[in-house]
Design a protein with these regions (language model features):
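Active-/binding-site microenvironments in catalytic and ligand-binding cores
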Residues: 1-176
Length: 176
């Protein structure tokens, strides 16, 4: 069995989307003083490798706490936008260029979810439209080049259960 970690490491000062809050991770308690470690995390809900809830770009979309956990994992395949898309699988794209014109092709495949590499050109209008059509989107995936090409694997990207959450950092993994 192979496990591929598809997640960015969260750290103070890491690159974030322009206009998003910066990441600050501050030590609050430590072993010498209190006998345990505890850090305060401050960041946006779409920082690093994350998932978008439908409410991220749709005023009528469900928030994270309203989406069942079984929607955040499933069989997936790593491919290019020019490939034939399999039906009823998660679709993971690497260094690619998706376009708004790809919307119908993606929707007709009835994807369980979309995974987008940190190196993928993914336009906001396409993201918005997919979320409005009920497609969960995992963003800023890394190490996708380690995934098997056009072969099915299991993808897991469970978010924190944030009340009224529009997104959440995740620990994304693929297992094959």
């Amino acid at each position: 069995m192979t496990v591929v970690d598809l997640s960015q490491t969260l750290k103070t000062g890491m690159r974030v989307y322009p206009g998003d809050p910066s990441v600050k991770i501050v030590q609050v308690h430590n072993l010498n003083r209190e006998g345990w470690r505890l850090k305060n995390l401050s960041m946006g809900s779409h920082t690093g490798t994350h998932v978008d809830a439908f409410s991220h770009m749709d005023k009528n979309g469900n928030t994270l706490d309203k989406i069942p956990p079984d929607k955040f994992f499933g069989p997936a395949v790593f491919l290019k936008s020019t490939d034939k898309l399999p039906n009823n699988k998660g679709l993971i794209f690497g260094k690619d260029r998706l376009r708004i014109e790809d919307f119908n092709k993606i929707i007709s495949a009835k994807p369980l979810f979309l995974g987008i590499s940190i190196n993928c050109d993914f336009p906001v209008p396409l993201e918005r439209k997919l979320l409005q059509f009920g497609v969960i989107i995992f963003g800023n995936l890394v190490n996708v080049e380690k995934l098997p090409k056009k072969k099915i694997f299991m993808f897991y990207g469970l978010p924190l259960k944030i009340k009224d959450g529009d997104g959440s950092p995740i620990r994304a993994v693929a297992i094959y």
